Amino acid sequence: GSLNDQMAKSISGAMGEVAASKFLGIKFEYHCNVGGVPDLIFKDLKLQVRTQLPKSNNKNSLIIRQKAEQNQFYILVIDEAPKFKILGFVNSTYVLGQEQWKTTFGLDRPFCYSIPPEKLTPINLLKDSTWN
């Protein structure tokens, strides 16, 4: 996309991280698009926040790439600025290697994992440490 699109996505992503950190009651670290570094740390858990604009077909999903690390927690946030909706989370360990989540979305690109919001764990269970 254009430079404006790239900047808008970076700002949206950062605001999704702010929303998640605010909900979890942790400090936002003010870094953006740093590969290999978790977006947030919560009680020694590495969190990756995925922020998306709402899709017109209501088909948002949490995207996890093939190269994701095991045991990182991925959070899906929908940017409905000024509101940001946290739809849930999943531990990458339970997604990586699972055929039912693999997709290319019909595009000529490497597959990724796509988890629908209804399959995510509610975010309040992460906050309360009661997801296990």
Q: What is each stretch, according to the model?
A:
Residues 1-43, 50-132:
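Nucleic-acid endonuclease domains
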